[in-house]
Amino acid sequence: MISDTTIRKLVDYISLNACSVNSSGLYNGKSGISLALFETAKCLQDTEIEDKAFSLFQESLIRKTNDYGFENGMSGIGYVLIYLITNKLIDADFEDLFGDQCEAIIKHFENIDKQPDKLLVSYKIIYFLFVLDKLQKQDERIYSIIEKIFQGLELYLSLQFFDWKNIYYINSKDYVLQMYEAYLKLVDFCNYKYFSKSLMDSYVTLYSEGRIASSLVRGYYLRSIITKNNMVGFNDVIRDHIRYGQKNINPAILFLDQKINLTGIIENADENCVKIQRIEMDLSEESLERIKRMVRPNCIHVGYQYGLARYLGFCTNKKFPLL
């Protein structure tokens, strides 16, 4: 990947710019940046970087927020805390540091099945709830919320696929497919066993009729899910998704986060190609200025979601969470 010298340049640049980041959340805030710095400190065995990471994360923990969401709110910070504790990056007691906030999050989402508008914008909280459930198995409310969100997503997607062929269909099909991709990723992440088989059948039928294009990402997660659950009958669809989806990749127009997200998927794809080598070359860039130019415009360029913190974490730990 990249040299230790370039990693340290990234650390200095991110640390310098982190002070101007106002959010405390995971995607665009200080907790996401601290996560990358903690991983880097472990990789380089550098206590100075660890101190920077700890300071940033402390700021995230003490800052008051009414946002309970995963991307930029309280549950994203909770996810980072659990990750740091379970991976022994810090020595801390979750209940002492985050017990009150955790209870507030659970109460906020306990009746999410009665708020469908909130459900479609809050589904990523499952990432937090899943790791929380492994930490606190005695709280039945946690799994209940996970189940309600999955069922809500499945109902929404089933209705969209049912109307897909209607000439008066007005919703954005790109958005619906993005939601389905996010749903598959969540099912795979949680090893969720009660996912809707009929929803998968509806998707496969639409694909077989030529109404949905191939997608490497959807093919990858479909393959992972059916393999884990010993399902049969989807091999042709998955093979075509991966084969043709890979052909649709154009490394020249991909942003930094897209290249990072594709690496693990491409490595597991059946067919290797020159495009993969191009992406790997881009992610091995030693020039900080060129790396910065790969970040999406109009985003928090040092952040975890799209920016340099994601890249730094990825470079220092191949198992860095890409959520």
Annotate each predicted stretch with a short phrase.
Residues N22-K30, N66-M74, K114-S122, Y168-V176, ...:
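Helix-start/N-cap signature of alpha-helical segments
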Residues M1-T5, K9, V131-L155, I167, ...:
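Terminal, non-catalytic domain-edge segments
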